[in-house]
C-alpha cells in the first residue's frame, strides 16, 4: 500500500470520535462447484422483489423518515431494483438512501463478514497460510478462498456471529437447503453500511487495518476474470476501499478482464420475515469507503438475462449520480 493510501485510512480513523455522536460471486461448496447454467434443481422462475409488496412497503416507510434530500436527481434505471445508503463519516448521518432495508443476496459482499469474523476469532498475527486465503478473497474476490474460510468458520454461524456483534437486523445466513452457498447470505444496504461503520469505529485497529487495507488495494481483475472496477471505482475519485459483488452472469466473463485496459444459481425468491430475497435475477453490488468522507453501499437486482457489461454501466451511473448528489 502506498503512503498516500495509508494516510487516507489513518485520516478515516482520525474522525472516528465524531461517529459516536451520530453515527462478493457465489459460494462454491468443497464437494462441487455449482454451475449457474446447468444446475436445474435450483432454476425456479424468479420472483421480482421491488415490483410491489415488500419493496413498496419499504418505500413508504422510508419516505416518512427524515433524510436530507440529494442535491440532484438519482434515478434507478428501469427494470432494476436498487437499495442504497450513503453515510457521512464525519457526522455519522445517513445522507441518502433508497430501499435501504430491502434484502438482496450478498454475492461476494459477504466476504467482508467472513474476513472480520476470522480476524476476531483468531488473535495475533495472521498465519501465512491463512493470509494466502484472506488477501486474495478481499482484493480479488477469490471464491475458492472464501469457500475454504466459510467452511472452516462454520458456514452460517459466521453470519449469525457478525449479526449479533454488529447489530445487523436484515442480514441472515443462506437458506437451510444451501448452507454452503455463502453468496446466498441475505444483506441490506443499511446493514452493509453498519458493517463499514463497525470497521471504522468499533473494530480493533488490527482488524480495521487488515480489512480496509486490502479493500483499498482491490485489483481491477477479479480472480474469476471479471472486471470488478464498476460502480464506485469508475464513478468517484480515489482514494477508496471497495468490496464488489456479482452473481448471475455465468462462471466465465464474456470478455476477460485485462489489467491494461461468477458463478450463480437460480432458486427463485425465498421469503425471510416478509422481506423476500430474489435468488434468480442477476445481482451487481458496489460498496466501500470513499476517502475519509463517505460510506457508500449500492445493491442492485438487474433485469433477467442482463449482460455483465450493461449491468456494470447501470451501476456505475447510479453510483456516480449518487456521489454527485451528496458530494
Language-model features and meaning:
Residues 120-136, 141, 153-155, 207, ...:
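Short, well-structured active-site flanking segments
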Residues 19-22:
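C-terminal motif of bacterial Sec signal peptides marking the signal peptidase cleavage site
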Residues 2-5, 24-39, 53, 57-82, ...:
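Penicillin-recognizing serine hydrolase domain
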Residues 1-14:
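N-terminal export and membrane-targeting signals
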Residues 92, 103-126, 137, 296:
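Active-site SXXK
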Residues 88-90, 108-110, 122, 141, ...:
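A mature extracytoplasmic/lumenal domain signature
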Residues 96-100, 140-145, 174-180:
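Flexible glycine/proline-enriched surface loops and loop-helix/loop-strand junctions
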Residues 147, 151:
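Glycine/small-residue-rich loop that forms an oxyanion/phosphate-binding "nest" at active or ligand-binding sites
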